[in-house]
Amino acid sequence: MTVPHIPRGPVMADIAAFRLTEEEKQRLLDPAIGGIILFRRNFQNIEQLKTLTAEIKALRTPELIIAVDHEGGRVQRFIEGFTRLPAMSTLGEIWDSEGAETAETHAEHIGWVLATELSACGIDLSFTPVLDLDWGNCAVIGNRSFHRNPEAVARLALALQKGLAKGGMKSCGKHFPGHGFVEGDSHLVLPEDGRSLDELEAADLAPFRIMSREGMAAVMPAHVVYPQVDTKPAGFSEIWLKQILRRDIGFKGVIFSDDLTMEGACGAGGIKERARISFEAGCDIILVCNRPDLVDELRDGFTIPDNQDLAGRWQYMENSLGHEAVQAVIQTTGFQAAQAFVAGLASPQDTAGGVKVGEAF
């Protein structure tokens, strides 16, 4: 059977379970779709995951980009057969107790293991690192954050990014310009951060600036309002995305929206209106998760925005390790030692409790 050539569209959707249904196959052939995000509900074991990703990639050319939230701690979608990754706050604790260089070395190992194991299963991208500062206010961020200190966050994220690159993956910093100061969970409410731009510049924006200079490939904005800067949430704001992120910071990479079904996005109107506002604000690619009915509503009469950079930006997010290369890495004693070391950093506190993040549960 001839594989259809369909340019990647600007929508990232999801699927229900372990295998594609015929309905999902038809949905994923729509020109509006360019990628898929997987969740825990899509994972049974490694062999099933490899079969699923191969099935997705065989649908069309260029292949759909496959992503996942696989940060470590309580946001690790695939467990059985994968190295258990520590929460990123573990690295912050090591930074404080053992020093910056030790923590950076550990962060690079985590990034390498994280990316290589996902690459071996046909995954292109993990939406990581979290660049939010841990102000002690936000339960949904909490131990997903490296540290409260902007320098520590930036340096640990850069080390993680270095490890991701060894495993064939690009980085995606989130949640611009910082979700750590607010109390609300933007999955459930629309939080407000009342600080001024100067206050944000002095702290939360610093890791994004540094990572942008050092090759961060993608950014995901927060569904948070910063009323002293703009009345719109950051992901819907031209001020935040076009003026501050693109012009002032000079970020050249991909802007992914956060999930447009989150409560923090719903106040903007129906799904078509949310999509329109996201694209006008400066998002390249939008996520619509856990609601295939909304994906179908969006697809109906969808006009692909004029974005001459879209094809190149999708291509940039492709995994850079071929199958043979990643299999060779996995067999090395050095990689296996890194797996064992990273697993030793994880703790029961990483795997149990805490706020659920982003799953339909």
Swiss-Prot record:
Lineage top rank: taxon: Bacteria
Catalytic residue list: 187 (proton donor/acceptor), 258 (nucleophile)
Cysteine-cysteine disulfides: none
Alphabetic keyword roster: Cell cycle, Cell division, Cell shape, Cell wall biogenesis/degradation, Cytoplasm, Glycosidase, Hydrolase, Peptidoglycan synthesis
Pathway membership, UniProt: Cell wall biogenesis; peptidoglycan recycling
Gene3D superfamilies: Glycoside hydrolase, family 3, N-terminal domain
Catalytic activity, EC: 3.2.1.52
Reactions performed catalytically: Hydrolysis of terminal non-reducing N-acetyl-D-hexosamine residues in N-acetyl-beta-D-hexosaminides
Entries under Pfam families matching the protein: Glyco_hydro_3
GO molecular function: beta-N-acetylhexosaminidase activity
Keyword Ribonucleoprotein: no
Binding residues for substrate: 69, 77, 144, 174-175
Keyword Signal found: no
GO cellular component, one term: cytoplasm
Top enzyme class: hydrolase
Biological process per Gene Ontology, one example term: peptidoglycan turnover
Main location: cytoplasm
Compartments it resides in: Cytoplasm
Function: Plays a role in peptidoglycan recycling by cleaving the terminal beta-1,4-linked N-acetylglucosamine (GlcNAc) from peptide-linked peptidoglycan fragments, giving rise to free GlcNAc, anhydro-N-acetylmuramic acid and anhydro-N-acetylmuramic acid-linked peptides.
Protein name stated in the entry: Beta-hexosaminidase
Organism: Neisseria gonorrhoeae (strain NCCP11945)
Lineage: Bacteria, Pseudomonadati, Pseudomonadota, Betaproteobacteria, Neisseriales
